[in-house]
Regions:
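Glycine-rich dinucleotide-binding loop and its adjacent helix/turn
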Residues: 106-164
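Mid-to-C-terminal Rossmann-like scaffold of FAD/NAD(P)H-dependent oxidoreductases
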Residues: 2-3, 22, 279-377
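Short hydrophobic core segments
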Residues: 6-7, 97-109, 231-241, 297, ...
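A Rossmann-like FAD-binding core segment of flavoenzymes
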Residues: 26-28, 73-90, 97, 164-262
Length: 407
């Protein structure tokens, strides 16, 4: 009997199931998820927090979808151990699940930095539905929330909380918000937009200590160039990065570094065992955005269907979007010009519009579009195709329609 077992019920796992389709070769597929609710679209947690959507709306598959694909989803029951020799998975409830092929899709958890008091049970990450539930449960008595980390998730969390009527302070150690995707100009536009929404943005600021009783956070000490300050706050949300969930793989003797090590076919060092998503590591890279995980799922599904001739997984540049209504920001590739690079930019800061292209050898290697993202996908296509833009270089910054009209 051919059985596929997938550890994890997140977006990576379900993308593999979608790619496998109905006519897969397995007699049975078992998916083990430690959450008690069916798979949901984690990308939509920010709109959910902002009360702009519902859990039902972001739950893509019903029971019938799984049944017709011979998939058993085991909810609320994590994995205790993987026995590689016996090819068997043991769950926390005591179930023993034999497998022919095993996929680690265990995802990641919020990385909480070593801040005094950050181990308080009331401290929250922003990764799961339970994190959103924990925030919503506090709304009745919640006056002020502090979000630590102004990367993509931190900005989304801050806006979501503000839309729920909570006063929010957003702390970021770097002087540039979303500093992995934005330059200083784009950051200043984002900061102004957040301030217009009533969010107190503090760049160059770090948490020092959290204070509270056994039930709740009460204060947070922060430090910046201006010195130390104490804020009254009832909720602290850390959005300071992620840590891959690799413990099961480590215990099973599977090779790991920061993540579970895989090759270009998503295979681990152990035959019949694969990994993808935020728990895996390929070519010294780990993952936090969904686009590369979709690529991995497509490759893995083909390999599981015994198509060893499938195109191997390759790193490629992806488009990053800020998923906050009213804030349009797209970032692709290099947002600062390195050696040999040129920059073309235009801006209207009074309107919150900024466009920047980074070029090297007459090819686009980076794009920033803020406020007006109309042409970002066109730029992305040119960049992905490695197109020579020398003939339209002088017009390129004005977008596709202008270039086509002038041609």
């Amino acid at each position: 009997m051919q059985t596929l077992v997938i550890i994890g019920n997140g977006m990576a796992a379900n993308r593999v199931l979608e790619e496998l389709g109905i006519n897969h070769q397995y007699d049975a597929i078992q998916v083990i998820g430690d959450e008690h609710i069916p798979h949901y679209n984690r990308i939509m947690l920010s709109p959910l927090l902002a009360n702009e959507t519902t859990l039902e709306a972001i739950t893509p598959h019903d029971d019938a979808w799984y049944q017709e694909r011979r998939i058993e989803v085991i909810l609320g029951d994590g994995v205790k151990a993987v026995n590689v020799q016996a090819q068997q998975v043991e769950t926390n409830s005591g179930r023993a699940l034999p497998y022919s092929d095993l996929v680690f899709a265990t995802g990641s958890r919020s990385f909480i930095p070593p801040v005094d008091g950050a181990d308080h049970p009331a401290v929250i990450g922003f990764r799961t539905m339970s994190d959103v539930d924990a925030m919503v449960e506090k709304f009745g008595n919640l006056k002020h929330a502090t979000v630590i980390g102004a990367g993509l998730l931190g900005v989304e969390a801050a806006v979501g909380l503000k839309l729920r009527g909570v006063d929010v302070t957003l702390l970021h150690r770097n002087p540039v918000l979303m500093n992995r995707q934005l330059d200083a100009t784009a950051s200043s536009i984002l900061e102004a937009s957040l301030a217009e929404r009533g969010i107190d943005v503090r760049t160059g600021t770090s948490p020092v200590r959290l204070h509270g009783n056994s039930d709740a956070i009460q204060k947070i000490e922060i430090k910046s160039k201006r010195g130390e300050e104490t804020l009254d706050t009832q909720l602290v949300v850390f959005a300071t990065g992620i840590a891959p969930n690799i413990e099961l793989a480590v215990d099973a003797g599977i090779t790991t570094q920061r993540g579970i090590c895989v090759n270009e076919q998503m295979k681990t060092c152990t035959p019949g065992i694969y990994a993808l998503g935020e728990c895996c590591e390929f070519d010294n890279q780990t993952y936090g955005l969904v686009a590369p995980i979709w690529d991995q799922a497509k490759v893995l599904a083909a390999i599981l269907k015994s198509n060893d001739d499938t195109a191997p997984y390759k790193e490629r540049t992806h488009l990053t979007k800020l998923k906050v209504s009213g804030l349009d920001m797209h970032s692709i590739g290099e947002y600062e010009a390195s050696e040999g690079g040129d920059v073309i930019a235009t801006e209207d800061l009074s309107e919150g519009v900024y466009r920047k292209l980074v070029l090297r050898e007459n090819k686009i290697v980076g794009v920033l579009c803020v406020g007006d993202v109309t042409d970002s996908h066109w730029y992305y296509e040119l960049m992905s195709d490695g197109a020579d833009i020398s003939s339209i270089r002088d017009m390129l910054i004005f977008g596709q329609a202008y270039c086509e009209q002038a041609a």
